[in-house]
Amino acid sequence: MTMEKNGGNSSRGGQVGGKSVCVYCGSSFGAKALYSESAEELGALFHKLGWKLVYGGGTTGLMGKIARSTMGPDLSGQVHGIIPNALVSKERTDEDKEDVNKALLESVENHKGATPISEEYGETTIVPDMHTRKRMMANLSDAFVAMPGGYGTFEEIMECITWSQLGIHNKPIILFNIDGFYDKLLEFLKHSIQERFISVKNGEIIQVASTPQEVVDKIEKYVVPEGRFNLNWSDEGHAHEDCAK
């Protein structure tokens, strides 16, 4: 995966002065209505601020909820979903499973087909695999937010955390801890710090928010923690250079 390093005020396709925020979340709604309500509120806040949502391209669960909310009732918001071809039939339930969208399917090879499938979900790009999906999502984003989700959400945000620790990027990483969803994970991370597998300073890579406004505030006020690995990735060719910008 490649990422861009600077998590400042630049935008990867959002409005001038706005941000592009990558949100990882579940393709289901979960057990509590509060998860869906919070996704809707966060999307509405992005819409109000003129921030762009970058997400996994699904129309179901929390993914679909935050995408529709970010677009807004007037469809003037900014959303870019990236989804692997194999997941279209599972996470794009608004589409005909036998004939998704010819223009989009052509983008599997050239990655230039950011053509809307449905206006209420903004732009969608179909890619050939998960690695390409994660790379594109990261490169398009100024910050990362994890809402409640499953294995995929955990893996995606943990990779972002690891790459920050390694000095590959400086972008804000926020756990949106709705109704204490991430409490046990945070306890485990604290345990790892106590057992000296994670340094205290590297524990500061992750910021925690409990409301949509706090998510935005944490992104805007994020300070890159000291104590991360000062590694030189220039010998890795192009594998990390986009992430280091």
Curated annotation (Swiss-Prot):
GO MF assignments: cytokinin riboside 5'-monophosphate phosphoribohydrolase activity
InterPro entries cross-referenced by the UniProt entry: LOG (IPR005269), LOG_fam (IPR031100)
GO term, biological process aspect, one: response to purine-containing compound
GO cellular component, one term: cytoplasm
Family: Belongs to the LOG family.
UniProt-listed NCBIfam families: Rossman fold protein, TIGR00730 family
PANTHER family reported for this sequence: LOG FAMILY PROTEIN YJL055W (PTHR31223:SF70)
Miscellaneous: Present with 6440 molecules/cell in log phase SD medium.
Protein's name in the database: LOG family protein YJL055W
Originating organism: Saccharomyces cerevisiae (strain ATCC 204508 / S288c)
